[in-house]
Amino acid sequence: MDLKKQYIIALDEGTSSCRSIVFDHNLNQIAIAQNEFNTFFPNSGWVEQDPLEIWSAQLATMQSAKNKAQIKSHEVIAVGITNQRETIVLWNKENGLPVYNAIVWQDQRTAALCQKFNEDKLIQTKVKQKTGLPINPYFSATKIAWILKNVPLAKKLMEQKKLLFGTIDSWLIWKLTNGKMHVTDVSNASRTLLFDIVKMEWSKELCDLFEVPVSILPKVLSSNAYFGDIETNHWSSNAKGIVPIRAVLGDQQAALFGQLCTEPGMVKNTYGTGCFVLMNIGDKPTLSKHNLLTTVAWQLENHPPVYALEGSVFVAGAAIKWLRDALKIIYSEKESDFYAELAKENEQNLVFVPAFSGLGAPWWDASARGIILGIEASTKREHIVKASLESIAFQTNDLLNAMASDLGYKITSIKADGGIVKSNYLMQFQADIADVIVSIPKNKETTAVGVCFLAGLACGFWKDIHQLEKLTTLDKKFKSTMDPNIRKTKINSWHKAVERALKWKEID
């Protein structure tokens, strides 16, 4: 085959928008198309989206990207799909219509149900051992249970054996294949609270616990399996050639693969509104003693699964947005580096803990609230901006230390991606405070690149990881220049501030 005239399209379905990106054999980005879709908040803590709007938006970007690239469908060698995780859709398999809106991963409507389950420590332990996850509204199981209990049409279709469940990847695959394939991959299945990550299969015991019938669940495949062919009517009326779906990964796992964190101990951090830190831990699902998640990273066909430890920072870029929108002390996020550098001229020991809605791992305190300590009469806006950027690095450092403690070795480097890696001040401070090398790739679309790589390996577009390494180039690298004693002092100040932020709501 003439590789110069072959392409891979990555479908990247995110939480607020979806994109399609066309890549060539040299990983050049030939074309990109993006569409946003609506999010609804019908009640406090409820977050929903329209599955049909997601589908039409994603399909439109796929068609648009192909047309922008001026390529034919028969020149597309494969498609890969990456998606927002945990979000659920239930639909009628006879007409393809959803029975309810998609319940999004941030949705908290099942918090009381999760709390009830968590009161039983035996159940809590069993679920963690099987899934690597805590019982939390974030994950899919209790969302499914809510629809089955509260939507009469769902109950009726379930009794008639006409109901199907899927995370967003399953929903898109089912639509792209015109209902021929009801499947998911191991990375998405591992986020449902229904998948045994040791046995690598749906757990009948967990399905019974959460009252979810196994019959509505998709078949679980390896991450670079054959997920079916995209029907020609989704390209154009005169489309020729069969285009297979050859890779599926949850978005954070896709970023891990896109950063080529393919060896145990390799770490990536996606710096966005929040942060997602994932570490490849190899083929054994080590359970964290520091409340990190253990999840399936990916599984290649005829290979054992690869697992990851995952930790989240709730507020990262959101802290900078808060400075702009709420405090109005900066006009754009781009100004943050300028002010942070300005603050270095009059250094202060100012610490900001942005616990707007609690703190995640390793603290796990929903009652924690934001706090700024060390304010003096000479404190100016630049000191608060600097402390805000530094808070992102401090929180990431806490996660890296938790991962290192779980696995018994020091982390020496991380690969960074996401919107706020543009901040040179943040990246340098991250290297300094964690004493790591921070590497940033030239191609910032690491999520899409991850499924592109996986699809390309599956269909022979690329031979192996070594070939992929030659396609990835570094944009920037940051190394620590901080004195170890200064680092220790700064971390101690951070932890003192965190201690004061914990259990704040209980003071009322």
Curated annotation (Swiss-Prot):
Inhibited by fructose 1,6-bisphosphate (FBP). GO terms for cellular component: cytosol. CDD domains: FGGY_EcGK_like. ADP binds at T15, R19, T273, G317, G419. Sn-glycerol 3-phosphate binds at T15, R85, E86, Y138, D251. Glycerol binds at R85, E86, Y138, D251, Q252. Pathway: Polyol metabolism; glycerol degradation via glycerol kinase pathway; sn-glycerol 3-phosphate from glycerol: step 1/1. It is an enzyme of class 2 (transferase). Its EC number is 2.7.1.30. One of its GO terms (molecular function) is ATP binding. It catalyses: glycerol + ATP = sn-glycerol 3-phosphate + ADP + H(+). One of its GO terms (biological process) is glycerol-3-phosphate metabolic process. ATP binds at T15, S16, S17, T273, G317, G419. Gene3D superfamilies: 3.30.420.40. Key enzyme in the regulation of glycerol uptake and metabolism. Catalyzes the phosphorylation of glycerol to yield sn-glycerol 3-phosphate. PANTHER family: GLYCEROL KINASE (PTHR10196:SF69), SUGAR KINASE (PTHR10196). NCBIfam families: glycerol_kin (TIGR01311), PRK00047.1 (NF000756). Belongs to the FGGY kinase family. This is Glycerol kinase. It comes from Mycoplasma genitalium (strain ATCC 33530 / DSM 19775 / NCTC 10195 / G37) (Mycoplasmoides genitalium).
